[in-house]
Amino acid sequence: MNFWNFLEILLFIGIVAAGLIVAVMIKTAEDTTLFDRTQLPEDNPQKLNYYVQPPPNGDEKVPFPTVFEPAKVYTTFVVPAYNEEKRIPKMLDETVEYLKSREAKDKSFTWEIVVVNDGSKDKTKEVVLNYAKDYPNIFLLNQPVNMGKGAAIQAGCLHARGELVLMVDADGATKINEFEALETEIKKLMKNNNQAIVVGSRAQNEKANRTPIRKFLGLGMHVLIVLSGVRGIHDTQCGFKLFSREACKMLFMNQHVQRWCFDPELLVIGRRLGMKISEIPVEWNEIEGSKMKISGMIKMAIDLIDIAIFHRVGAWTIRDRRINK
């Protein structure tokens, strides 16, 4: 085999490899968003249906409203939950206590908690339904199979009734009273733009209690996040973010990333749509059992590469009109 034949073989292998990579990328880019799957006709087997299942309706399944309908309450608290039967009771107790206290001081302060059960294998669903028996403001949105934290947040926000929508983790790492700081900030932003996002930041608060290893890994991930297109945000991954209803309408029907790294994509979409985005410090403490495995970080890195490529080349298009369904 001479040199030129060797080069031809290398070129052929390179073309085949490139073709496979492009094919995979195109397939990934063509995947519909969760929003698209909720809009499919009733007889389509891929259609996603979400139901609220609290008593006193018994076993009756009641369809959720959508974020495209008029708001019914002041704030929706969206809580993604996967195998959280042990941790979510404490979080719900603290949240309900805070919300009832606010409600007692201000009758116009209306609220709901939407817990999105993301295919839990434990008793998370039953625990939440028990709370729903006592509190008509608590709803269960059930995903029969695990689809990822991003999918859970997306589903909850697409079906929120609130004028404001807060995503908050089930582990209670950020205390719910930090909501007031985000609430004050988003009201300032909404004076000039009703599409607004406020990001809770652990990086800006010295009270954030993280181990050195977590800080180091977080720094490496932040470099990838910047490359994905996020600008001006120090901490994209804190599970405490507040959205205006108008922002929710645009963000979550365009979200593609379904698992851990959905937050940067939301910020990329918001930036491209000219939304007002702000970041403020929150008190946050690392909770036992909240650590991410190395395999999870690798998947996050892949998601960030997808965001950087697909949004830049237009494979993931952003719909810039409201869709009322």
Swiss-Prot record:
Pathway linked to the protein: Protein modification; protein glycosylation
GO cellular component: endoplasmic reticulum membrane
Primary location: endoplasmic reticulum
Keyword list, A-Z: Endoplasmic reticulum, Glycosyltransferase, Membrane, Signal-anchor, Transferase, Transmembrane, Transmembrane helix
Chain ranges on the Lumenal side, renumbered to this chain: 1-5
Keyword Calcium on entry: no
Membrane topology recorded in Swiss-Prot or TrEMBL: Single-pass membrane protein
Record-level Gene Ontology MF annotations: dolichyl-phosphate beta-glucosyltransferase activity
Lineage top rank: taxon: Eukaryota
Family annotation (PANTHER family): DOLICHYL-PHOSPHATE BETA-GLUCOSYLTRANSFERASE, GLYCOSYL TRANSFERASE
Family of the protein in this entry: Belongs to the glycosyltransferase 2 family.
Protein name: Dolichyl-phosphate beta-glucosyltransferase ALG5E
Secretion signal, residue range per the UniProt entry: none
Catalytic activity reported: a di-trans,poly-cis-dolichyl phosphate + UDP-alpha-D-glucose = a di-trans,poly-cis-dolichyl beta-D-glucosyl phosphate + UDP
Phylogenetic lineage: Eukaryota, Metamonada, Parabasalia, Trichomonadida, Trichomonadidae
A GO BP annotation: protein N-linked glycosylation
Regions that span the bilayer: 6-26
Subcellular localization, as worded in the UniProt entry: Endoplasmic reticulum membrane
InterPro entries: DPG_synthase, Glyco_trans_2-like, Nucleotide-diphossugar_trans
